[in-house]
Amino acid sequence: MLLPINRKKFKGFKYYDKRFLNKSFDPGNKYSIPYFWGTLGIVYNDKFVKRSEVESWDQLWSSKFRDKILLVDSARDDFAFSLISMGKSVNDKRPADVQAAKAKLDALMPNVKAILDDEIVMYMVQEEAPIGITWSGEASEMIAENKHLHYVIPKEGSNIWFDNLAIPKTAKHFKAIYKFLNFMSEPKNAAQNAEYVEYSTPNKGAIKILPKSVTGDQQFYPSNKTLKNLHVYSDLGQKWTQIYNDLFLEFKMTSR
């Protein structure tokens, strides 16, 4: 599906932070170039919730949050925080663990107001709920629209995701492709792009250019300690992907 990156034609890896290279989905970055990155976490509204009340995934199950939580409509992500709350891997394929994570999600249902796709941004901005589980990219959109919203990566850890640049096998115009890839990796261009999109950049050259108000915001540029506790998703394979999806559908049908 993808062609390997030609290191003689692409000169931009030197600009990228090593913490965001050589991930399990592409050892050695043979096929991919990191474009943006982010996390899964909790958005809360400080008019109704204190930060200290949402610093752990386990706190979501508190009875005081009945009918107050919005979930992202994603089997992998919702199972991830349930598994993490039990001290398990986000890539768990042990039947007992996955079933236990499902049971724990079922127990959360009284606290779930809705399970949403992209509209979770609008719901949180309009204060339809005080808590939302979502990705950092969408969280940045929410925060830009409502000063009372904040984003937390729970202390137990979470998922770290990447948007990557890659070359499909069907590609033909390689001169233009590598010109584009090198252009996008130039620190000044990567910095401008990050400011426009409002996602976290893995480009260390861009980090030096971006204002400290951006790169110093630990909601979206967390500490090394936090980064070490973030995990990429592995491909579960067709069988286990279907198991997760089936169990998630059962969860969504759970009576409140």
Which ranges hold each PLM region?
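Extracytoplasmic ligand-binding site segments that recognize negatively charged/polar headgroups
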Residues: 1-111, 116-128
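Short beta-strand->loop
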Residues: 2-15, 32-33, 147-159, 168-171
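A bilobed periplasmic-binding-protein/Venus flytrap-type ligand-binding module shared by bacterial periplasmic
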Residues: 41-48, 84-85, 161-176, 184, ...
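Short, hydrophobic alpha-helical packing/hinge segments within bilobed ligand-binding/sensory domains
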Residues: 57, 120-123, 139, 177, ...
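Periplasmic-binding protein-like
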Residues: 98-107, 113, 145-169
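A ligand-binding cleft/hinge motif common to bilobed small-molecule-binding domains
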Residues: 125-126, 131-148
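Mature extracytoplasmic/periplasmic domains
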Residues: 168-228
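Conserved C-terminal helix/tail region of periplasmic/extracytoplasmic solute-binding proteins
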Residues: 225-256
